[in-house]
A protein has these predicted regions:
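GH16 jelly-roll
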Residues: 1-148
Length: 148
């Protein structure tokens, strides 16, 4: 869909070495302009609201000053469900956690439909921090809501 509010109740992973995320993304990252807007949980209570924008000038990471910090109290991201939201309007993107605005990006011209995606991955850059005895360390999704 084009524009809307995307929200989910998520318990993020507790340990580093892998990442859980909620994202809205375009269909084809080879067609510009393209954007992916994400909530990422990287373990140890670190959360990152951010976006990656591609245009004819290249790739631009749009990170908040809160990105990669402990936005919630210790243990909250991995021990309980929290509500993560991304609002997409014709004026830009806004990230929320438990109803509180955390990050905002204005004036990104994207008018193509995007999809909502949840992933749990281990990137090559994360692998050195992965401790196998801490697995399983899943992300859990309680519910998902999408508004136009």
């Amino acid at each position: 869909q084009v524009n809307g509010y995307f929200e989910a109740s998520i318990r993020m992973n507790a340990n580093p070495g892998h990442t859980g995320n909620m994202s809205i993304r375009g269909k084809d990252d080879k067609v510009v302009p393209y954007i992916i807007a994400l909530w990422e949980g990287t373990g140890e209570d670190y959360l990152a609201p951010w976006a990656r924008y591609l245009d004819d000038k290249g790739q631009h990471d749009l990170r908040s000053t809160e990105s990669g910090k402990k936005i919630l109290k210790g243990g909250e991201p991995s021990k309980k469900f929290n509500t993560y939201g991304i609002l997409w309007t014709e004026k830009g993107f806004t990230w929320f956690v438990n109803g509180k605005q955390i990050h905002k990006v204005d004036r990104i011209a994207i008018a193509a439909p995007m999809t909502l995606q949840f992933t749990h991955r281990i990137g090559e850059w994360e692998r050195p921090k992965l401790v196998l005895k801490n697995l399983p360390d899943d992300i859990d999704i309680d519910w998902v809501k999408v508004w136009k």
